[in-house]
C-alpha cells in the first residue's frame, strides 16, 4: 500500500492550506490517482489496523438500497451516526441513488441491477457507470456523496473499477473507500463470471484535516506489510445475496490502530 502513503506524503508536502465546511481546516490537493492490482492482494491498509466489519456492512447496506442507520447500528457499525436524524434517517444518500434513482417520469432506476445486466450482455460498453450525485436531491442528503461516481471496464476476462471521489478525507475515509470499492469489484467479478482486474482511485479534492497531521506523520514512519487475501463464498452468484459471513480475510497483519477525530 505504498501508493496510499505516497498520497499522504504528497498532500503534506504539496497541499494548500484551506478552510473547510467543518471549520477544522485542511491541507488539500486537487487531482490525484492511485492504482491497485487486485491480483496482488486485497488493498486493506497495513500501516494501521482497519475495522473490516464496518467496511463490509456499509457496502452491503449500500447495495440493499438502505438509507437508515438501523442495520448498521444493529451490526456494531457507527460510522454514519453523526449525520443521521433522530429516526436514523440520512435522506436519499448512496443506497437510494444506487438502487432507486428517481426518473422524471416517475420511474425509479436500479443502477446496480442495470450495471450487472450490461456487464453480462455488453462487457465492452463504455456506459458501465453508477452515479450517486443527483443534483436535484443533494440538499436533501445528510451528507452529499463523497465517492460519487464509479465505472467498470472489462478486458481480457478481467473486471476493473474506477472511482471518482470529489472529496476525500485522506487519513480516515480513503482507506475505507479503497477497501470498499475493491471488495465491490471482487463481488461483481464473481457474479458476472470475470476475474478481478484493477481498482483505480481518482480524486478531486484530496485533503488531510489539520488535526490529522500528527497521525499521518506517524503512519508514514511505518513500513507496509504484505497484503491480505479476501476470499468470497464461491457459491454466491447473486450480488444482492451476499452476507457478512460470505467474506473471509486471510493473512491480515497490520500495525496498531491510530486514533483520529472525525470532522462533521
UniProtKB/Swiss-Prot annotation:
Please tell me where dUMP binds in this chain. Answer: 21, 126-127, 166-169, 177, 207-209
Q: A single GO molecular function, which one?
A: thymidylate synthase activity
List the InterPro entries hit by this protein, alphabetically.
Thymidate_synth/dCMP_Mease, Thymidate_synth/dCMP_Mease_dom, Thymidate_synth/dCMP_Mease_sf, Thymidylate_synthase, Thymidylate_synthase_AS
Q: What is this protein called?
A: Thymidylate synthase
SUPFAM superfamilies registered for this protein in UniProt: Thymidylate synthase/dCMP hydroxymethylase
Q: Does the keyword Transferase apply?
A: yes
What does the annotation say about its assembly with partners? Homodimer.
The reaction(s) catalysed by this protein are: dUMP + (6R)-5,10-methylene-5,6,7,8-tetrahydrofolate = 7,8-dihydrofolate + dTMP
Amino acid at each position: 500500500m505504498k501508493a496510499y502513503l505516497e498520497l499522504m506524503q504528497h498532500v503534506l508536502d504539496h497541499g494548500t492550506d484551506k478552510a473547510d465546511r467543518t471549520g477544522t481546516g485542511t491541507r488539500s490537493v486537487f487531482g490525484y490517482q492511485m492504482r491497485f492490482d487486485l491480483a496482488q492482494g486485497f488493498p486493506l491498509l497495513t500501516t494501521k489496523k482497519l475495522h473490516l466489519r464496518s467496511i463490509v456492512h456499509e457496502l452491503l447496506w449500500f447495495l440493499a438500497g438502505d438509507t437508515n442507520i438501523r442495520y448498521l447500528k444493529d451490526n456494531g457499525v457507527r460510522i454514519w451516526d453523526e449525520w443521521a436524524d433522530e429516526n436514523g434517517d440520512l435522506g436519499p444518500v448512496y443506497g437510494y441513488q444506487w438502487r432507486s434513482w428517481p426518473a422524471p417520469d416517475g420511474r425509479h432506476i436500479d443502477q446496480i441491477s442495470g450495471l450487472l445486466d450490461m456487464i453480462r450482455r455488453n462487457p465492452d460498453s463504455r456506459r458501465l457507470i453508477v452515479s450517486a450525485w443527483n443534483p436535484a436531491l443533494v440538499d436533501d442528503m445528510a451528507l452529499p456523496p463523497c465517492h460519487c461516481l464509479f465505472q467498470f471496464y472489462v478486458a481480457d476476462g478481467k473486471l476493473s473499477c474506477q472511482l471518482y471521489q470529489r472529496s476525500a478525507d485522506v487519513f480516515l475515509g480513503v482507506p475505507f473507500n479503497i477497501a470498499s470499492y475493491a471488495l465491490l469489484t471482487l463481488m461483481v467479478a464473481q457474479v458476472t463470471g470475470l476475474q478481478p482486474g484493477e481498482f483505480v482511485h481518482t480524486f478531486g479534492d484530496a485533503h488531510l484535516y489539520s488535526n490529522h497531521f500528527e497521525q499521518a506523520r506517524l503512519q508514514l514512519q511505518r513500513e507496509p506489510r504484505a497484503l491480505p487475501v479476501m476470499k468470497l463464498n464461491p457459491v454466491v452468484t447473486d450480488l444482492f445475496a451476499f452476507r457478512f459471513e460470505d467474506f473471509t480475510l486471510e493473512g491480515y497483519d497490520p500495525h496498531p490502530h491510530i486514533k483520529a477525530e472525525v470532522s462533521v
